[in-house]
Design a protein with these regions (language model features):
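Asp-based, Mg2+/Mn2+-dependent phosphohydrolase catalytic module
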Residues: 1-20, 112, 121-235
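Residue-level marker of regulatory loop/turn positions in helix-turn-helix DNA-binding domains and
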Residues: 97, 116, 147
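Hydrophobic residues in well-ordered beta-strands that form the structural core
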Residues: 32, 115-117, 191
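Intrinsic disorder/low-complexity segments enriched in polar/charged and small flexible residues
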Residues: 43-46, 115, 210
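N-terminal helical cap/lid subdomain that shapes the substrate entry/recognition surface
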Residues: 4-110, 120-122, 133
C-alpha cells in the first residue's frame, strides 16, 4: 500500500514513495555537463592559482558566485561570476542527457515536476536544450532565490510552484549540498551516484541511493488524482 506524504525513515526504505511532485536537480541528475564544467572551472582555477581538481569539486551543486565568494573573498564577485557564466554558456561540448532522464520526465505529468538548479536561468536553458530534454513548465534557478543550496529555499520554492509543500515532494539530487537542501525542505531525497560515493550521499541525508534515473519509474496521477507513486526498480 502506498504511504501518505508523512513518512517515517523506516517507511521510505521500501521501494515506493507517494508524493505530489518531483523536484529534479539539473546537472548530474538529468544532464551530464561534467566535461564542460571541468573545463570552465579549470581555466578559472589556474588563472587564480588554485588547484583545479579542488575547485571543480567545490563548485559542484552550488551557485557559481558562492564558490567565487568562498575562494576569492576580496574579488569583484559579480564580474568573476559573469565571466564564468559566459564561458559555461558558450561551452556545451559533450553536454548530454543522463540515462533514464528523458524517459522519467516523459512519464510524469508536466505539472507534477520541476527543475531546481544552482545554474542561472540562461545557463539551465542552454544545457537543457543541448541535452535534448523537454523544457520544464516550472523551474527554480539561482536568479529566483536569495539563498542557494544547501539552504532549503530553492526546493521550498520548487514545491510551491507545484502547489505542494516540501514534505509532499521527492527531490532527486546528486550533490551533497543539494541533498542537504532537500532534506532541510522536508522532502524525501533520492540520490544518484553520478558525483559522490555512497558514504557521502548517506551522510548528507539521502533516503534512497540509485545509479541513475533509469532505476526509477513513476505511476502517474490519473483522472485528477493528486499523488504520484515513485518507484525504485529492484533486481
Amino acid at each position: 500500500m502506498a504511504q501518505s506524504p508523512e513518512r517515517t525513515l523506516d517507511e521510505v526504505r521500501v521501494n515506493s514513495i507517494r508524493c505530489r511532485g518531483v523536484l529534479f536537480d539539473l546537472d548530474g541528475v538529468l544532464v551530464d555537463s561534467t566535461p564542460a564544467v571541468a573545463r570552465v572551472w579549470t581555466l578559472w582555477a589556474r588563472r587564480h592559482g588554485f588547484d583545479p581538481e579542488t575547485v571543480v569539486r567545490e563548485a559542484h551543486g552550488k551557485p557559481s558566485i558562492a564558490t567565487i565568494r568562498e575562494l576569492l573573498p576580496n574579488a569583484n564577485h559579480e564580474a568573476e561570476n559573469k565571466e564564468v557564466e559566459r564561458r559555461e554558456i558558450e561551452d556545451t561540448d559533450g553536454v548530454i542527457a543522463l540515462p533514464g532522464a528523458l524517459e522519467l520526465l516523459r512519464a510524469i505529468p508536466p505539472e507534477k515536476w520541476a527543475i531546481v538548479t544552482s545554474c542561472t536561468r540562461r545557463l539551465a536553458e542552454v544545457r537543457i536544450g543541448a541535452a535534448g530534454l523537454p523544457n520544464p513548465k516550472r523551474m527554480v534557478t539561482s536568479n529566483d532565490t536569495n539563498n542557494g543550496k544547501p539552504d532549503p529555499e530553492p526546493y521550498l520554492k520548487g514545491a510551491h510552484l507545484l502547489g505542494a509543500t516540501g514534505t509532499e515532494c521527492v527531490v532527486i539530487e546528486d550533490a551533497p549540498a543539494g541533498i542537504r537542501a532537500g532534506k532541510a525542505a522536508g522532502a524525501h531525497v533520492v540520490a544518484l551516484r553520478t558525483t559522490a560515493g555512497d558514504e557521502e550521499l548517506r551522510e548528507s541525508g539521502a533516503d534512497w541511493i540509485v545509479n541513475n534515473c533509469a532505476e526509477l519509474s513513476v505511476d502517474p496521477a490519473n483522472n485528477g488524482e493528486e499523488y504520484l507513486l515513485l518507484r525504485r526498480r529492484t533486481k
